[in-house]
């Protein structure tokens, strides 16, 4: 006969072992933050995590997302933009991922107010995309496309 204490300890060890296993879905990356502050990234698949020493800081989707930027003004005209972006370096993006939409809106508005913005719509779109990528590349983000249109 097995002692209830041994049985409880065995059940506790099994539950702890199950809590250590994480399945990361395809197209996502988890960033883990240790108690010492170091960051570890986990790609798709099964991984072992130390639940008391590490916690999931962010679940980052690598598929891409969009951000609408309204109230862009150029001269007498109002514009609106849709910025299509994706995370290319989760370790660098971990720092800004909580407010990535705000970062993209503020940066797009600041660049749109730039004095030497091209007059042609396609050239303006290309310039804006290149300028956003120049600023956001070091933060692990890539702007894939920008839809820019005059506001109705």
Task: Label every PLM stretch briefly.
Residues 1-2, 50:
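Membrane-helix interface and helix-disruption motif detector
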Residues 2-21:
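Single-pass alpha-helical transmembrane signal-anchor segments
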Residues 21-32:
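Juxtamembrane/interfacial segments flanking transmembrane helices
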Residues 26, 36-37, 88-90:
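A generic structural motif
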Residues 30-51:
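Membrane-cytosol interface motif
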Residues 57-152:
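Amphipathic, interface-forming alpha-helical segments with heptad-repeat character
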């Amino acid at each position: 006969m097995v002692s209830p204490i041994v049985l409880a300890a065995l059940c506790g060890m099994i539950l702890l072992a199950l809590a250590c296993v994480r399945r990361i879905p395809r197209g996502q990356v988890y960033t883990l933050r240790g108690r010492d502050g170091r960051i570890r990234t986990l790609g798709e698949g099964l991984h072992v995590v130390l639940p008391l020493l590490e916690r999931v800081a962010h679940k980052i989707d690598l598929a891409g997302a969009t951000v609408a930027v309204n109230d862009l003004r150029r001269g007498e005209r109002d514009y609106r933009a849709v910025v299509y972006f994706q995370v290319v370096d989760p370790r660098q993006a971990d720092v800004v991922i909580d407010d990535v939409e705000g970062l993209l809106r503020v940066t797009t508005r600041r660049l749109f107010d730039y004095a030497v913005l091209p007059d042609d719509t396609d050239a303006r779109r290309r310039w804006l995309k290149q300028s956003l990528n120049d600023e956001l590349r070091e933060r692990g983000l890539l702007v894939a496309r920008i839809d820019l249109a005059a506001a109705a």
